[in-house]
A protein has these predicted regions:
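Subtilisin-like peptidase catalytic core
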Residues: 60-130, 234-235, 247-251
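A cross-family glycoside hydrolase active-site/sugar-binding cleft signature
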Residues: 94, 123-127, 151-155, 176, ...
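Extracellular S/T/G-rich loop segment that most often corresponds to the catalytic His/Ser-adjacent loop
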Residues: 163-233, 237
């Protein structure tokens, strides 16, 4: 066991904010980010859009200081990470369209792009269907072995499962619980979805300015991504399995999931 994880297991998570944290690259695969919002101004390093052009999934770079959001979902998610982890460098990958959906192929293309870029933490506040399970397993496992942490949301309404990639062992799956984000969270025993974080009544940045209140697994997930960014900022050599161990050791005991 490395000295980093031994220290990380002892330090209260809230104390990490008092440290000189290294910058950590955090990708947000979502509806885009409104980088003109005061809460997110200067936080987005690069921005992309993933679309289907002539039958091919195409990844296009866009200006990182503009409104790249389609519906406001990604802006909300990004603001949670930005608030929790001041050391997070945000990378915006827009995969959702104006109808808040995307094809499994576009989502898979976004995940492949994120893992190929080598971003340390990848937040996925969305879920794919099961048709591409084999492809997603291969991509997520490769990222895991490269030391990348993929944090993914459980489906708010499960349809035959918890959703991909959240239920894959190479990811950290997150469900919605009745906790005070971000430093209180639970561990779900006997489930592929490992953590339960506070995602109810969360005040987030609204696209176009101002703030709004949201609820859902989508907003519990970035709380865990933010904590991973804090841990990696303090202990850059931590591996995904060590992040899982640290988070489990700090989780409240029991299946404290909100009904």
């Amino acid at each position: 066991m490395s000295s980093s994880i031994l220290e990380a297991l002892e330090v209260p998570l809230s104390d990490l904010l008092r440290r000189n944290l290294a910058p950590v690259d955090v990708a947000i695969l979502d509806s885009g980010i409104d980088a003109t919002h005061p809460m997110l101004s200067g936080r987005v390093v690069e921005a992309f859009g993933v679309t289907k052009t002539d039958g091919q999934d195409t990844i296009v770079a866009v200006a990182q200081d503009t409104d790249n959001d389609q519906i406001g979902h990604g802006t909300a998610v990004g603001s949670i990470i930005a608030r929790i982890a001041p050391n997070a460098r945000l990378f915006d990958v827009r995969v959702l369209g104006a109808d808040n959906t995307c094809s499994d192929e576009i989502l898979a293309a976004g995940i492949r792009h994120g893992t190929a870029k080598g971003w340390a933490v990848i937040n996925l506040s969305l879920a794919a269907g099961y048709r591409l399970r084999g492809d997603l397993e291969a991509v997520c496992e490769a990222a895991y072995y490269r030391g990348q942490a993929l944090i993914a949301a459980r489906r708010n309404i499960p349809v035959g499962g918890d959703g991909l990639p959240a239920e894959l062992p190479s990811c950290i799956g997150v469900d919605l619980g009745s906790y005070q984000a971000p430093f209180e969270f639970g561990f779900l025993i006997g489930s592929p979805i490992e953590l339960i974080a506070g995602g109810e009544g969360i005040v987030v940045a609204a696209r176009g300015g101002g703030f709004k209140t949201v609820t859902g697994t989508s907003f519990a997930t970035p709380a865990i991504s933010g904590l991973c960014a804090l841990l990696l900022g303090a202990f850059p050599d931590l591996q995904p399995y060590e992040l899982k161990s640290i988070l489990r050791s700090r989780a409240l005991i029991g299946n404290q999931k909100k009904a």
